[in-house]
Amino acid sequence: MSQQETHGFQTEVKQLLHLMIHSLYSNKEIFLRELVSNAADAADKLRYEALTNDALYEGDGELRVRISADKEKGTVTIEDNGIGMTRDGVIEHLGTIAKSGTAEFFKNMSGDESKDSQLIGQFGVGFYSSFIVADRVTVRTRAAGHSADEAVLWESAGEGDFTVETITKQSRGTEITLHLRDDEKEFADDYRLRSIITKYSDHISVPVEMYEEGTPAVEATEEGGEAIPATEGHWKLMNKATALWTRNKSDVSDEEYQEFYKYISHDFTDPLLWSHNRVEGKQEYTSLLYIPAKAPWDMWNRDRKHGLKLFVQRVFVMDDAEQFMPSYLRFVQGLIDSNDLPLNVSREILQDNKVTTALRTAVTKRVLGMLEKLAKNDAEKYQSFWTEFGQVLKEGPAEDFANKERVAGLLRFASTHTGEATANVSLADYVERMKEGQSKIYFIVADSYEAAANSPHLELLRKKGIEVLLMSERIDEWLINHLTEFDGKKLHSVTRGDLELGELEDASEKEAQEKLETESEGLVKRVKDSLGDKVSAVKVTTRLTDTPACVVAGEGEMSTQMIKLMQAAGQDVPESKPTFELNPEHPLVARLNDEQDEQRFAQWSELLLQQALLSEKGSLADPSAFIKLMNQMLLASVK
């Protein structure tokens, strides 16, 4: 036995332990789910490693998890004969949190116990959940392939530090003993433990056993009672010990599917929906796919691991097999069990493999089908999904050309038709409501819903009763650069180029517009001469009715929102000048047209331009100059 060493917990571990003890008291029984899950994973990992090194079994290939309790001592022990851990592995896995984005996770803590509980569940508490019910935890472990005298003893009270020392342990695997707090002794009760184990372990493919005490013999009685022989204590199987996904769907209850989701995702909440599918023929595989009810806290972390659990012929191969799911569906949880991949498959082999490509195509279509069915049959439930994952789904049209139209059909937007900020209008809804003669889907992208809904660019369209989709999420500009049409209808920005109403504009309106442009030629020239190269062009508007002026981007130029996105990303943006549109029928523009003093004319022109830029961009390059000019104009008007 080596000298005992004391190590300090990583700062994040201390924070997590504190948060768990204070936030998870209402979900305290999940400690058993987490520890049984870890034990089953250890068995799966040994089974996989032993494919190429059978000696790791050490003559004991019957993998299992065993749970026992000692009521007198107030302890619960979870033991497995899986892969085990080395001394370095113990220090690494039981003293640190090796997760990217950990600091961001702790920033998201609100102090609200119910919200923090859910967040901790998404983060995944694993081994540390032991301290929800225990004031001391002892771990004895030996890694497969290592000698008995290379085993390790780890112990901690869940405070600032833990101790590690080398011990002798004959059996392979890990044994975790929880020394229960005085107010948590209920978990040392056999009946209580059995009910939890049954709830959390029935779907696990590794046998989960619990020790059942023997009973003494009972002699026959004179009244005719039969003698009952003594029974010996033994380990009793507590679960079906068959992989849930290998069973027929009709034999699996909703509760079992829900518990299996929690087992693989470490989530506390039930999934929104799931799909269990078995395919036979040219390719043979089983998939079990889940859509969570809530988005993970680190969904936007680029380093976040995602993907499905991969099994080959029911043997666990790897977690987070991202090759089977496109990035825009990274929220999907579940597994795929293939009969066509080699057991020694690696991530590198998966990258360039025909089977992988075919499976990815199939499971992607299945997820999209799940969402299409949900959107059709339960709009309220789909709206809940969209609120959580809509922004991620908007990455789809750029990433998945083959399914672009299907993904587009799942998108939801706010609209002038509903008059509310909730994004609940589909492109199909829009097309169904299009006016006779309308050939385009009109939209606007702005910084906020309010900015989009109140934009002057919508004035003529509102007057004509033409619906406009209102987009205000950062990803929307990226989206519409890749989603240019739907159902044969072009998507058209109301802030770029000409409005192009086509047949929505009758002959008399076109004639009136042409007359107005002819009458305003002099004004347009004067304004362009006054503003010079601040604008690319000046023209009479086709979109304003109540506002004096607006700016629009050229047809082939970047929109205001795209420029903002690129600047925020630190990228150089090519200089572009807006087109300045005037509404000659507005009193301010009429006043401008009557102005004979060229200096005053230039000031009015500049003021209208700055107003239009402020309305479009939400800010000005030189706000002080704008205020100074406006004050000059106000003073002049009251003299």
Swiss-Prot record:
<dbReference type="InterPro" id="IPR001404">
    <property type="entry name" value="Hsp90_fam"/>
</dbReference>
<dbReference type="GO" id="GO:0016887">
    <property type="term" value="F:ATP hydrolysis activity"/>
</dbReference>
<dbReference type="GO" id="GO:0005737">
    <property type="term" value="C:cytoplasm"/>
</dbReference>
<dbReference type="InterPro" id="IPR036890">
    <property type="entry name" value="HATPase_C_sf"/>
</dbReference>
<keyword id="KW-0067">ATP-binding</keyword>
<keyword id="KW-0963">Cytoplasm</keyword>
<dbReference type="GO" id="GO:0005524">
    <property type="term" value="F:ATP binding"/>
</dbReference>
<dbReference type="Pfam" id="PF13589">
    <property type="entry name" value="HATPase_c_3"/>
</dbReference>
<keyword id="KW-0346">Stress response</keyword>
<comment type="function">
    <text>Molecular chaperone. Has ATPase activity.</text>
</comment>
<comment type="similarity">
    <text>Belongs to the heat shock protein 90 family.</text>
</comment>
<keyword id="KW-0143">Chaperone</keyword>
<dbReference type="InterPro" id="IPR020575">
    <property type="entry name" value="Hsp90_N"/>
</dbReference>
<dbReference type="Pfam" id="PF00183">
    <property type="entry name" value="HSP90"/>
</dbReference>
<dbReference type="GO" id="GO:0051082">
    <property type="term" value="F:unfolded protein binding"/>
</dbReference>
<comment type="subunit">
    <text>Homodimer.</text>
</comment>
<dbReference type="InterPro" id="IPR020568">
    <property type="entry name" value="Ribosomal_Su5_D2-typ_SF"/>
</dbReference>
<protein>
    <recommendedName>
        <fullName>Chaperone protein HtpG</fullName>
    </recommendedName>
</protein>
<dbReference type="InterPro" id="IPR037196">
    <property type="entry name" value="HSP90_C"/>
</dbReference>
<dbReference type="GO" id="GO:0140662">
    <property type="term" value="F:ATP-dependent protein folding chaperone"/>
</dbReference>
<keyword id="KW-0547">Nucleotide-binding</keyword>
<feature type="region of interest" description="A; substrate-binding">
    <location>
        <begin position="1"/>
        <end position="347"/>
    </location>
</feature>
<feature type="region of interest" description="B">
    <location>
        <begin position="348"/>
        <end position="564"/>
    </location>
</feature>
<feature type="region of interest" description="C">
    <location>
        <begin position="565"/>
        <end position="639"/>
    </location>
</feature>
<dbReference type="InterPro" id="IPR019805">
    <property type="entry name" value="Heat_shock_protein_90_CS"/>
</dbReference>
